Amino acid sequence: MQIENHKEEVPFAHYEEKFRDLDPADVVSRLSAVKWDGQNFTVKLLGRTFLIAHPAYAITAVDGGNIPSLPTQTFLLRYLLECKDVAWTGTWKTFREMPWGELYIKPYTGRALTRAAFTFGTRLDAFRKAAEKMGAAPVSHGDAGYQFELVSGYHMQMLAWAGDEEFPPNAQILYSDNFAEGFVAEDRVVIADILISTIKANM
């Protein structure tokens, strides 16, 4: 693959190389929802199912739709390489409340919360329709709010408030508490970006 966008391509190439040496038995022992048929891993992301070939990486959408963006593919590689099942206790956390959240809160606010506020808070009806199209469950928080399953066992809530004459639109993203152990802070930023982009693509 010819590298044109180094910011996205270089991390992908790094994890693609590590993926070649991955032991499928190790993956399915850590991630109970991931299946391995001897040629492909089956992975579900935000309601869509993908086949990921191994050892020579290739990704296919089972629904025949578009394959994910390169940053999303990089995340899926990291998920297979590093993630594990962690039980959810049923509680929710903001990004700031999880390990290293305070350190990353400024870039996270701009990349995730402000973007979500002005993408969804200004178009609540379109947000609702997109979330429902993705199979998300409505929640009672915010002017509009929905719960999504990112990958098996890891849940997120996207909450949006419309602005008015005094206040701009607002948004909050909640993570099931197992994200604190299951994903590092950098991944939690990327995950928020993936969720926002996926909802937006369905609007």
Residues of each region from the PLM?
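Charge-rich alpha-helical segments
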Residues: 1-18, 38, 56, 65, ...
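Amphipathic, interaction-prone secondary-structure segments
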Residues: 27-55, 137-162
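Short Lys/Arg-enriched alpha/beta "domain-start" segment
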Residues: 1-39, 71-72, 80-134
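Domain-length accessory/inserted modules outside core catalytic folds
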Residues: 50, 104-112, 116, 140-142, ...
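Conserved binding-pocket/active-site segment within a compact domain
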Residues: 121-181
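Short, charged/polar micro-motifs that form catalytic or ligand-binding hotspots
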Residues: 62, 66, 117, 144, ...
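Ampiphathic alpha-helical segments that act as solvent-exposed interaction surfaces
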Residues: 67-89, 174-203
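Intrinsically disordered, low-complexity regulatory segments enriched in Ser/Thr/Pro
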Residues: 48-74, 161-186
